[in-house]
UniProtKB/Swiss-Prot annotation:
Keywords on record: Endonuclease, Hydrolase, Nuclease, Nucleotidyltransferase, RNA-directed DNA polymerase, Transferase, Transposable element
Record-listed E.C. numbers: 2.7.7.49
KW Transport (keyword) present: no
Organism field: Nasonia vitripennis
Enzyme category, top tier: transferase
Entry's Gene Ontology molecular function annotations: endonuclease activity; RNA-directed DNA polymerase activity
Lineage of the species this protein comes from: Eukaryota, Metazoa, Ecdysozoa, Arthropoda, Hexapoda
Domain Reverse transcriptase positions: 1-118
Protein's UniProt name: Retrovirus-related Pol polyprotein from type-1 retrotransposable element R1 2
A Pfam family this chain is assigned to: RVT_1
Catalytically driven reaction(s): DNA(n) + a 2'-deoxyribonucleoside 5'-triphosphate = DNA(n+1) + diphosphate
SUPFAM superfamilies named among the record's database cross-references: DNA/RNA polymerases (SSF56672)
Record-annotated disulphide pairs: none
InterPro entries: DNA/RNA_pol_sf, RT_dom
Amino acid sequence: GCPQGSIGGPILWNLSMNGMLIELAGSGVSVCAFADDVAILAEGNTRKEVERVINEKMEIVYKWGEKMGVSVSEEKTVCMLLKGKYVTSNRAVRVSKTINVYKRIKYVSCFRYLGVNVTEGMGFGEHVRGMKVKVAKGVQKLKRVLRRDWGLRRAASHLVLRGTFLPQVSYCASAWYEVLKYEYGRNALSAAVRYVMYACLNVCRTVSTEAMQVLTGWLPWDLECLKRANVYKVRKGLSMNEMDVVKNEEVESSSVIKLERLVDERVYEIWQERWVVSMKGRVTARFIKDVKYAGRSRSFEPDRWVVNILTGHGTLNAFLHKRGLSESASCMCGDVSEDWEHVLCRCSMYESFRNLDEMGVTVCVNGEYEFTGVLSSNVTYGKMCEFINRAYEMRESVRRRLNLELDVNG
């Protein structure tokens, strides 16, 4: 591989490798050169024919190594079947290193090339599945500066987290993005982005990924990878397939700039449709209808208590009782259910400082509440945040007093 950490290393590496590439090209094979790693793709109608081609090309590689005074890594040199159903029970391929000296190349079912994990049959499932572990480890390292109660503000933490992990996840998406048409691929990316969003949102672990995505305003990462893959194909003039959001006819009749805008519009349309039909995050959906809202709003930085109301998940008794964490779902005011809507709109404990009109909450004819007006302006949103924080402070104060009285009388 290319020496790491030096300025001139890659240039010198390219110069030294050029001789081997010229010899390989002269032997009648197509050469596609990438810095750092070397891969030889051999094809044939039988396994014996494939091994013969590999043998010829590896002999060139070994001779080049002897000439340059370097050795080929036996540990990293492996072979794998990318297509076809040749017998691989032997799990090794013999190639001639020198005259009458043979080396066995280990057969593997998965290898990492240029940062992408490739499996037999040209599959990328392992690459996508591995993202969850990779992202989780990275998030743990960043938690010291991304605390919930102190540290970077929302905008900065979002920028750091998204800027750190999205490029890692979407790297080389144009090669493997078709894996995302399968549920396991989408679930793997969803699990990865969940770690990142949880690190910069004041939410309970029980909040759905769909709701977190809307609260951050981040395009779901499977759609982000689809978008980047489509933009890459548009810029390179590559043929589109049924999974892509633009068609070949549109590519032929539109400019690159218009196509990039079209790709962006359509992936957001897909996200909006998902949010409308989803069964998850329905409390959040009563406040935020447009998935682009959080991404556009500079003032939307909900704290812990506000997020509890926007998601319906938190320390309220109705939520805790449903999960067996509270003996009763009742409110201290005497109501049978202390849920988010009760606290925000009906609880008599907070009646003295509640003003639904100022918060943008509308009472419908049937007695139900409409909350889309809450986020229609900074004024209504600010009034709601002010009310929620004041209500939670009073609630905690009353709970402490009641607990103290129980301790005294107990």
